């Protein structure tokens, strides 16, 4: 699944099956519909924190965001899932705080006096520098949230061991 390319339901894209967002456990249909509307209006999401800001107030909650991360929806943005998981509370809190300030007309920390209180585009999300989850942990998260192994399979590590094994068909 991809936060910018996946639709609500499964779709076929250039002969490949694109995973539907409704199949991700913990992500409601209301959030998915809002996400698709937001992509049409504001274009693709370019960063994780931008996604959280734009989707704030649209049924977005910690559980849904963590499910999207575990399913790999932000992988194509270049983030490590472990770093995102460690930053969820901070980023969601910042998005909610920014939304509250915008409602009250206050400028935020990154606003210039002449920009109407809007955040400057030069701000960039800083994530913790951590090692990524192991391959086994990543595919286990995918299986937990989608019911499928998406980027690998637990038996992949044993493929080389199985290659030299031969077999004979027996007919009785």
Report each predicted region and the residues it spans:
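Sliding clamp-binding short linear motifs
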Residues: 2-170
